[in-house]
């Protein structure tokens, strides 16, 4: 690919995204599909665009993204994290603005495991007094 390309890895829940950024006109390709084709939900598309809108680069950069694992929400979060990291590699002066918006920090929340004797992670079986 091009030599003036920047890379960022993003993770969220069980999803991992690899994001490549290069100067262009705003094309976003995710797993060989457009953003609109890949994410049916508008909220997921919005999450993906957030870091670009924050730094006014929506129409200035082309994004090539591969993402694996998890569901729609996790993948969107992973892509956002990856875009943020790639933007920081592209221009380090954007770090402060992105940090303030909370995009730089990896969201460490994971699904809590189911425990033996319980129905779910914390849901206990119904208690009967008599």
UniProtKB/Swiss-Prot annotation:
Keywords: Ribonucleoprotein, Ribosomal protein
One Pfam family this sequence matches: Ribosomal_S9
GO-annotated cellular components: cytosolic small ribosomal subunit
Signal sequence annotation: none
Entry-linked Gene3D superfamilies: 3.30.230.10
GO-annotated molecular function: RNA binding; structural constituent of ribosome
Family: Belongs to the universal ribosomal protein uS9 family.
HAMAP family noted in UniProt: Ribosomal_uS9_B
NCBIfam families (alphabetical): PRK00132.1
Protein name according to UniProt: Small ribosomal subunit protein uS9
Species whose genome carries this gene: Pectobacterium carotovorum subsp. carotovorum (strain PC1)
């Amino acid at each position: 690919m091009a030599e003036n390309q920047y890379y960022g890895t993003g993770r969220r829940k069980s999803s991992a995204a690899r994001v490549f950024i290069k100067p262009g006109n705003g094309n976003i390709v995710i797993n060989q599909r457009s953003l609109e084709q890949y994410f049916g939900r508008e909220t997921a598309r919005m999450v993906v665009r957030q870091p670009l809108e924050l730094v006014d680069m929506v129409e200035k950069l082309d994004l090539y993204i591969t993402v694996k694992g998890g569901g729609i929400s996790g993948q969107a979060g992973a892509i956002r994290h990856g875009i943020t990291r790639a933007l920081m590699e592209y221009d380090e002066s954007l770090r402060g603005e992105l940090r303030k918006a909370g995009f730089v920090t990896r969201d460490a929340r994971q699904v809590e495991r189911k425990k033996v004797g319980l129905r779910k992670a914390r849901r206990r079986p119904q208690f009967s007094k008599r």
